[in-house]
């Protein structure tokens, strides 16, 4: 799993994302006890979560800020040492340490930078590749992409190059058997429309969110693209 965040919309959307991601991680942790609801029995499941953040890149005003892999509250930047921690990024959600580390990661989220989604997905792929499923074990591999803005340097302007780079990374993930969910809280986010690459910024953003998810461009029910216009809905 991945929790990715963009930053250019500021604290308001970040404050909406934090409880949403917390609820997600708590739900995953609750599922580790299996159908019987009792920890330490045969049907326990060791669900795991890893967290990355994405924001700025090399040509941003704050170069590579908030583009990182989290291990607990520690942050390892994409441009320096993030790849060294791909192998240790996953946290076991059936253990107190794993749950505490994910809580600490969520607490360390910051809102400052751009919205280069492609780097978040690239790091997500790196973590999955560094942690192959052992022989004889079955796992569903999932990326959950949270974003509060359009892909690119400015959250209010759709950047086609950034979007296309993200779609390349999404295709890599899907070709490796990953299910990819996208969650948008930017103004105009609408999971019921296919969007339009050549339309307005909002139309293009909805097109992107459909394409990057495992909807693969076609609105579905249930959907791999989830949207919420405000914190309460999310």
Model-derived segments and spans:
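P/S/T/G-enriched low-complexity
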Residues: 1-234
């Amino acid at each position: 799993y991945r929790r990715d965040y963009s930053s250019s919309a500021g604290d308001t959307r970040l404050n909406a994302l934090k409880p949403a991601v917390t609820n997600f991680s708590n739900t995953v942790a609750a599922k580790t006890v299996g159908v019987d609801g009792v920890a330490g029995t045969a049907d326990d499941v060791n669900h795991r979560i890893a967290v990355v953040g994405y924001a700025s890149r090399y040509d941003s005003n704050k170069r590579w800020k908030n583009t990182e892999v989290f291990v607990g509250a520690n942050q390892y930047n994409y441009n320096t040492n993030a790849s060294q921690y791909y192998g240790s990024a996953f946290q076991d959600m059936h253990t107190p340490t794993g749950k505490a580390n994910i809580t600490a990661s969520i607490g360390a989220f910051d809102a400052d930078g751009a919205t280069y989604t492609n780097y978040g997905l690239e790091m997500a792929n790196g973590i999955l590749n560094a942690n192959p499923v052992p022989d004889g074990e079955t796992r569903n591999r999932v990326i959950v992409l949270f974003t509060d803005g359009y892909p690119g340097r400015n959250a209010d302007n759709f950047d086609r190059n950034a979007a296309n780079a993200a779609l390349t990374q999404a295709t890599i993930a899907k070709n490796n058997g990953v299910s990819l969910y996208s969650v948008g809280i930017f103004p105009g986010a609408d999971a019921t429309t296919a969007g339009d690459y050549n339309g307005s910024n909002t139309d293009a953003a909805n097109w992107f969110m459909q394409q990057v998810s495992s909807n693969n461009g076609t609105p579905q029910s249930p959907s791999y693209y989830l949207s919420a216009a405000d914190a309460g809905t999310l």
